[in-house]
């Protein structure tokens, strides 16, 4: 689980939890069958207006010496078909068993090209 931050053309932020897979040095994020308005999702509208995004992966522990996070900043694209879409769906299904029974082929995948990585805590170093 990670958190995807997008912003609209006016810079208004929007953050949502997402499932992801790493593929070819990029991250793929599914738009799956869980109840939502797939084609009208705020994250998709924001990426169409402003492709700059951030992904945050964090770790919480009651022992605060073991806290940490990684933030990936990059450029997102909405991939709806083709070989890159197929590879993204395959990578997501490999990582998440739940996706194996979902019809992801007709749904877009968000691809995030990594431009900068920042980390803190147990992930820095």
Question: Residue locations for each model-derived region?
Answer:
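Short, surface-exposed beta-edge/turn micro-motifs
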Residues: 1, 50-53, 67, 106-107
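Short beta-strand segments
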Residues: 1-36, 55-58
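Short gly/ser/thr-rich secondary-structure transition/capping motifs
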Residues: 36-38, 92
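Residues that form or flank phosphate/diphosphate-binding pockets in enzymes
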Residues: 38-39, 65
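Short amphipathic alpha-helical segments and helix-helix/interface helices
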Residues: 41-44
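Charged, gly/pro-rich active-site loop segments
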Residues: 60-125
């Amino acid at each position: 689980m990670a958190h995807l931050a997008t912003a609209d053309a006016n810079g208004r932020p929007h953050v949502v939890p997402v499932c992801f897979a790493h593929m070819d040095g990029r991250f793929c994020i599914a738009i799956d069958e869980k109840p939502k308005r797939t084609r009208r999702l705020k994250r998709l509208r924001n990426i169409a207006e402003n492709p700059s995004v951030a992904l945050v992966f964090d770790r919480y522990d009651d022992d605060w010496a073991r806290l940490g996070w990684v933030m990936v900043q990059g450029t997102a694209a909405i991939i709806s078909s083709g070989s890159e879409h197929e590879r993204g769906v395959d990578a997501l299904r490999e990582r998440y068993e739940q996706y194996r029974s979902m019809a992801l082929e007709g749904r877009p995948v968000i691809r995030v090209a990594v431009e900068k990585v920042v980390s803190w805590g147990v992930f820095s170093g």
